Swiss-Prot record:
Glycans are attached at residue 53. Belongs to the IL-17 family. The gene is IL17A. This is Interleukin-17A. It comes from Bos taurus (Bovine). Keywords: Adaptive immunity, Cytokine, Disulfide bond, Glycoprotein, Immunity, Inflammatory response, Innate immunity, Secreted, Signal. GO terms for biological process: adaptive immune response; cellular response to interleukin-1; defense response to fungus; defense response to Gram-negative bacterium; defense response to Gram-positive bacterium; fibroblast activation; gene expression; granulocyte migration. Residues 1-23 form the signal peptide. GO terms for cellular component: external side of plasma membrane; extracellular space.
């Protein structure tokens, strides 16, 4: 989870930097610069992918996936054509939820919690340093919900 959190934070910082540069907030634009709304404004920027602050000072329990009433396991999703190349995704351990006695209760449903993230996708194999932004839906955990019951009339 810490690796996934670090990757998510680095992408968030990267996207914030791109947005600030495009808006001209970080680098003041001289009067001769084209406005960002101009169709001739460049759609490409150079970004250094080295993360400045990889360590975080927050110490949180990392066993939520085991203690939850809807436990999950983490599976490695690896794609060398994507940055970050490794993203950890959750998979619910049961279709039902764990009750107070520690047994699976099939009157409740375990469902994944999904988060949309932005990743960098390699443009082509011929240009290894060229990436484009891509949305990706990632399962980050599971939760317990009441089932949807449909009554036939």
């Amino acid at each position: 989870m810490a690796s996934m959190r670090t990757s998510s934070m680095s992408l968030l910082l990267l996207l914030s930097l791109v947005a600030l540069v495009k808006a001209g907030v970080i680098i003041p634009q001289s009067p001769g610069c084209p406005p960002t709304e101009d169709k001739n404004f460049p759609q490409h920027v150079r970004v250094n992918l080295n993360i400045v602050n990889r360590s975080t000072n927050s110490r949180r329990p990392t066993d939520y996936h085991k203690r939850s009433t809807s436990p999950w396991t983490l599976h490695r999703n690896e794609d060398p054509e994507r940055y970050p190349s490794v993203i950890w995704e959750a998979k619910c351990s049961h279709s039902g939820c764990i009750n107070a006695e520690g047994k699976v209760d099939h009157h409740m449903n375990s469902v994944t919690i999904q988060q949309e993230i932005l990743v960098l996708r390699r443009e082509s194999q011929h240009c290894p340093h060229s990436f484009r932004l891509e949305k990706m839906l990632v399962a980050v955990g599971c939760t317990c919900v009441t089932p949807i019951v449909r009554h036939l009339a």
